[in-house]
Design a protein with these regions (language model features):
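Active-site helical microenvironments for divalent-metal-assisted chemistry
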Residues: 1-175
Length: 175
């Protein structure tokens, strides 16, 4: 394993150390970025170190006090650029952020599309396995429908990951 990937894991673990996922067990947040890297490497066949590091770091700017300058200092321009492409502007209302994800999905780099695919796969799996306790079945279906809309802009990025995401999206009717 490359030292940069270990550095990204340690960095993300520190940044997310006080955060929990919304699942029933309130699992440590770091499980999510690790899951993305696992999906990319072991299911998508992705070995690109920049993509794997960006997957580990993908929520650091959006959900912690991490700055773009900090990521640049530790991880350089390419990884930081990928992270920025998949980072929502938390100053915007949630519905606007969701709309922009759909609108921008087809315009982001190939590397960012891979991270976005893995993010959607991880989130849908988590919702299926252990959804947030306060989510109704309608809310779960809405999330799956939104993931489908984002997925449409990610086509042509990685056949294996797209197939996994397609199969997960089809399960929305199980709610």
């Amino acid at each position: 394993m490359n030292n940069l990937l270990i550095t990204a894991l340690v960095f993300a673990a520190d940044k997310h150390k006080n955060q929990r996922r919304k699942d029933a067990g309130a699992s440590p947040y770091i499980n999510h970025p690790i899951a993305l890297a696992n999906v990319l490497a072991n299911e998508g066949g992705i070995a690109n170190l920049d993509v794997l590091c960006a997957a580990i770091l993908h929520d650091t700017i959006e959900d912690t006090e991490t700055s773009e300058a900090e990521l640049l200092e530790y991880f350089g321009n390419q990884i930081t650029s990928i992270v920025l492409e998949v980072t929502d502007d938390k100053c915007l209302p949630k519905e606007e952020r969701k709309r922009l994800q759909v609108e921008h999905a087809s315009q982001i780099s190939h590397e960012a599309k891979l991270v976005k695919l893995a993010d959607k796969i991880s989130n849908l799996r988590d919702i299926l396995a252990s959804p947030p306790a306060d989510w109704s079945n309608d809310r779960k279906r809405e999330y799956f429908e939104w993931a489908r809309e984002v997925r449409n802009g990610l086509r042509g990025s990685n056949h294996k990951l797209e197939k996994i995401l397609d199969e997960l999206i089809e399960r929305k009717d199980s709610f």
